[in-house]
UniProtKB/Swiss-Prot annotation:
Source organism (scientific name): Corynebacterium efficiens (strain DSM 44549 / YS-314 / AJ 12310 / JCM 11189 / NBRC 100395)
Oligomer status and interactors: Homotetramer.
Name the UniProt record assigns to this protein: Nucleoside diphosphate kinase
One of the GO biological process terms: CTP biosynthetic process
Catalytically driven reaction(s): a 2'-deoxyribonucleoside 5'-diphosphate + ATP = a 2'-deoxyribonucleoside 5'-triphosphate + ADP; a ribonucleoside 5'-diphosphate + ATP = a ribonucleoside 5'-triphosphate + ADP
Gene it is expressed from: ndk
Classification of source organism: Bacteria, Bacillati, Actinomycetota, Actinomycetes, Mycobacteriales
One term under GO cellular component: cytoplasm
């Protein structure tokens, strides 16, 4: 089934020079880039994106990090795009859950700065795409 998902290459992925390799991995997997935008996220967008974590102690730190430097927001589409992207990304904890060969397993060291984000369901993808790309 063809799906669309939001991807973010977070500020650590951009500032550490991993954008080209991450995009290459997406394309090698057979996924298509439907939209790609380099931007500095504003606080309102970041807070909407992470609203499910608003009552958690790390919320402020998460918003500060995601708005701290440029990031890449993108839409990836293809057959089972959500699962395919999550497989490429690896587990959210890059040391204990992300295996080598995944983006997080290869490029990240902490849960807070784990290089990429991807929607975890079709519903999340629809919501997140509308936040980051309201005109699409």
């Amino acid at each position: 089934m063809t799906e669309r998902t939001l991807i973010l290459i977070k500020p650590d992925g951009v500032t550490n020079g991993h954008v080209g390799e991450i995009i290459a991995r997406i394309e090698r997997k057979g996924l298509k880039l439907a939209a790609l935008d380099l931007r500095v996220a504003d606080r309102e967008t970041a807070e909407k994106h992470y609203e499910e974590h608003a009552d958690k102690p790390f919320f402020g730190e998460l918003v500060e990090f995601i708005t701290s430097a440029p990031l890449i927001a993108g839409i990836v589409e293809g057959e089972r795009a959500i699962d395919a992207w999550r497989q490429l990304a690896g587990g959210t904890d890059p040391v204990s859950k992300a295996t080598p060969g995944t983006i997080r397993g290869d490029f990240a060291l902490t849960v807070g700065e784990n290089v990429v984000h991807g929607s975890d369901s079709p519903e999340s993808a629809e919501r997140e795409i509308s936040i980051w790309f309201p005109n699409l």
